[in-house]
Curated annotation (Swiss-Prot):
Source organism of the structure: Pectobacterium carotovorum subsp. carotovorum (Erwinia carotovora subsp. carotovora)
Residues involved in Ca(2+) binding: E99, N153, D157
Disulfide bridges in this chain: none
Cytoplasmic side: 1-173, 246-379
PROSITE patterns (alphabetical): T2SP_F (PS00874)
NCBIfam families for the chain: GspF (TIGR02120)
Keywords: Calcium, Cell inner membrane, Cell membrane, Membrane, Metal-binding, Protein transport, Transmembrane, Transmembrane helix, Transport
Region of interest (Disordered), residue spans: 38-58
Organism ancestry: Bacteria, Pseudomonadati, Pseudomonadota, Gammaproteobacteria, Enterobacterales
A Pfam family reported for this protein in Swiss-Prot or TrEMBL: T2SSF
Protein name from the UniProt record: Type II secretion system protein F
Superkingdom field: Bacteria
Gene Ontology CC annotations of this record: plasma membrane; type II protein secretion system complex
Length: 408
């Protein structure tokens, strides 16, 4: 998309100048007329071509819309479409309404594609960094069925639910993370600064030190001598782990082991199955074909092993296996969810049963997160208290011994 300098007459007949983004001079004139201007001259700004090209590239690949921004844009667009406003005008209104420049530019670019004759879904597919496959598939289904406003409202609900879930997880993790950092910092300062100064006095007295004090001195020396190297080793290990996870086989193997951990595995399985069921419910309610809906729903899974198992379930459904049987073969879904899906298949209300199953799984996920954090926080506090108590006792024991010797 290029930039064009223009001279035009406004509604009062006054001359005005400015720039207009468009794919061609003809489109620039058309956009100016839609703004109520009479174009006198439209010249391409060639000095900005390279900049414009890089902007287009960033729109296509680099911009990542937050779920809150995406939900807001979708809700605004759904409201305008439901009010029978033409799609081009609705997109223009959303672009002008946005206070964030990159969002306004994105919606203007989508509008430009629509005005070229593309469908809304195809226009959004041109910007995969901003609109994921699930979003584009639902918009396409809404355009085909003639219920675009209802589908957009459903999409807005979906993105808002995702944002709420992410916010709940982030808020739940704030306190344990802060507590962990504080605990590590306190113990590190005690071992590297406080303990050496106190123990130094005992060494000058040439007194036989108890075992706990000698252990504490060894720990303190290790922290001061090898502390930086230990940090470097941890950083190197973390980077090596990240590199290892880039290999698909090892990543799938790690994700498979993750799902089998006692408590973390249940939480990860609950989060992924709830996300899959909710996505499949929305796609099915939007008249997306089941196989396509299953493929897209599998793509939203954060666990690669679960994604692989669900791709096998999609193949099984393609071969004629019922949905609940195919999902049972994955060994990911709890029995209650499978029974609800089977009931939905028999009654013809699969989308509503999938939504109820996702709601149940969300509640179970929340309870599991609460349990995990409820166990972690007191364990961390007790562990920190035990370490501090050991340090205090290791310092007090020589002092008590010295007092005993002096009194005797």
């Amino acid at each position: 998309m290029a930039q064009y300098h223009y001279q035009a007459l406004d509604a009062q007949g006054k001359k005005c100048r400015g720039t207009q983004e468009a794919d061609s001079a003809r489109q620039a004139r058309q956009l100016l007329r839609e703004r109520g201007l009479v174009p006198l001259s439209v010249d391409e700004n060639r000095g900005d071509q390279q900049k414009s090209g890089s902007t287009g590239l960033s729109l296509r690949r680099k911009i990542r819309l937050s779920t809150s921004d995406l939900a807001l844009l979708t809700r605004q667009l759904a409201t305008l479409v439901a009010a029978s406003m033409p799609l081009e005008e609705a997109l223009d209104a959303v672009a002008k309404q946005s206070e964030k420049p990159h969002l306004s530019q994105l919606m203007a670019a989508v509008r430009s594609k629509v005005m070229e004759g593309h469908s809304l879904a195809d226009a959004m597919k041109c910007f995969p960094g901003s609109f994921e496959r699930l979003y584009c598939a639902m918009v396409a289904a809404g355009e085909t069925s003639g219920h675009l406003d209802a589908v957009l409202n459903r999409l807005a609900d979906y993105t808002e639910q995702r944002q709420q879930m992410r916010s709940r997880i982030q808020q739940a993790m704030i306190y344990p993370c802060v507590l962990t950092v504080v605990a590590i910092a306190v113990v590190s300062i005690l071992l590297s600064v406080v303990v050496p100064k106190v123990v130094e006095q005992f060494i000058h007295m040439k007194q036989a030190l108890p075992l706990s004090t000698r252990v504490l001195m060894g720990m303190s020396d290790a922290v001061r001598t090898f502390g930086p190297w230990m940090l470097l080793a941890l950083l190197a290990g973390f980077m090596a782990f990240r590199v290892m996870l880039r290999q698909e086989k090892r990543r799938v193997s790690f994700h498979r082991r993750l799902l089998h951990l006692p408590l973390i595995g249940r939480i990860a399985r609950g989060l992924n199955t709830a996300r899959y069921a909710r996505t499949l419910s929305i796609l099915n309610a939007s008249a997306v074909p089941l196989l396509q809906a299953m493929r897209i729903s599998g793509d939203v899974m954060s666990n690669d092993y679960a994604r692989h198992r669900l791709s096998l379930a999609t193949d099984a459904v393609r071969e004629g296996v019922s949905l609940h049987k195919a999902l049972e073969q994955t060994a990911l879904f709890p029995p209650m969810m499978r029974h609800m899906i089977a009931s939905g298949e028999r009654s013809g209300e699969l989308d509503s049963m999938l939504e109820r199953a996702a709601d149940n799984q969300d509640r179970e996920f929340s309870s599991q997160m609460t349990l995990a954090l409820g166990l972690f926080e007191p364990l961390l506090v007790v562990s920190m208290a035990a370490v501090v108590l050991f340090i205090v006792l290791a310092i007090l024991q020589p002092i008590l011994q010295l007092n005993t010797l002096m009194s005797s």
